[in-house]
Amino acid sequence: MSNMMKALVKSKAEVGLWMEDVPVPEVGPNDVLIRVKKSAICGTDVHIWNWDQWAQKTIPVPMVVGHEFSGEIAEIGSAVTRYHVGERVSGEGHIVCGKCRNCRAGRGHLCRNTLGVGVNRPGSFGEFVCIPESNVVPIPDDISDEIAAIFDPFGNAVHTALSFDLVGEDVLVTGAGPIGIMGALVAKRSGARKVVITDINPHRLDLARKLGIDHVVDASKENLADVMKAIGMTEGFDVGLEMSGAAPAFRDMIDKMNNGGKIAILGIAPAGFEIDWNKVIFKMLNLKGIYGREMFETWYKMIAFVQGGLDLSPIITHRIKIDDFRDGFEAMRSGNSGKVVMDWM
């Protein structure tokens, strides 16, 4: 195996990513080197491409980025015992310290020292990625490489949707991006009574309909209260999944929640936006922030959803060769795409 590889690198502090030859990552005793077959583009990668304020404060330059992937094990460290070369895998992109109180209590997803693959350390937009053995997730034979490549965002959706009991509940999802749509699908499959999803992007609304979401609302044209009445809702929503990061959507969600309602918040909102805290208080709402996936319970659950028949393939709207990565990022930046999966093989 060559000691060099192709990779997408944030090599300059400006807009874009660049395909370069870089060294293959070194494998430590507890590490696993994975040959990447499929990579998916995340919204985080778009922020890095755009070199916005968050990216400028967060991303070291130069660095290989990317964190949504699937592949097969190419090499294992001397102390690795659970995996073997050739095994099909994906990986948890949040690397935790294992030493803080939350980690020691089995709550690794709450680690205050979390490092993100492709954000704080070299990522998976390369022919190889190296992660700790503890972050490797085997992929069953009946799950394809491209579906495994979107398990990271699907895990965000599963973690958010399953934060609260859904059986018999009326659920509002704000934001019909890929994660919002997947969250709505999980809610529907988990026994929710009514599932309503809102957005203002026509392409994303059409994609939600294509995936089988029953009640799809264009918030720029339709009044949510009228939709609730039309579908037989006489009280507010029991559970809210905020996936948009849009202040107007979050405010509308709070307004439409039933007393005692529960809201899981994944969307990253602009700093300093206002909500009516009196509604939160007097409706006795429960707000829960979500970041990433529960390690590793969410992975077991999402594998079970897919093996149980949940078809995520329509959420992948663009399949491209890695040399055409600019086309993939153009599609993502336009807002007129679902997931974009890039083929390294």
Swiss-Prot record:
It comes from the Bacteria. Zn(2+) 1 binds at C42, H67, E68. The record marks D152 as: Important for catalytic activity for the proton relay mechanism but does not participate directly in the coordination of zinc atom. Zn(2+) 2 binds at C97, C100, C103, C111. One of its GO terms (molecular function) is L-threonine 3-dehydrogenase activity. NAD(+) binds at I179, D199, R204, L266, G267, I268, I290, Y291. One of its GO terms (biological process) is L-threonine catabolic process to glycine. Keywords: Cytoplasm, Metal-binding, NAD, Oxidoreductase, Zinc. The active site is at T44 (charge relay system), H47 (charge relay system). GO terms for cellular component: cytoplasm. It is found in: Cytoplasm. Pathway: Amino-acid degradation; L-threonine degradation via oxydo-reductase pathway; glycine from L-threonine: step 1/2. Binds 2 Zn(2+) ions per subunit. The keyword Metal-binding applies. It catalyses: L-threonine + NAD(+) = (2S)-2-amino-3-oxobutanoate + NADH + H(+). Its EC number is 1.1.1.103. Its cofactor is Zn(2+). The keyword Lipid metabolism does not apply. Belongs to the zinc-containing alcohol dehydrogenase family. PANTHER family: L-THREONINE 3-DEHYDROGENASE. Catalyzes the NAD(+)-dependent oxidation of L-threonine to 2-amino-3-ketobutyrate. Homotetramer. This is L-threonine 3-dehydrogenase. It comes from Rhizobium etli (strain CIAT 652).
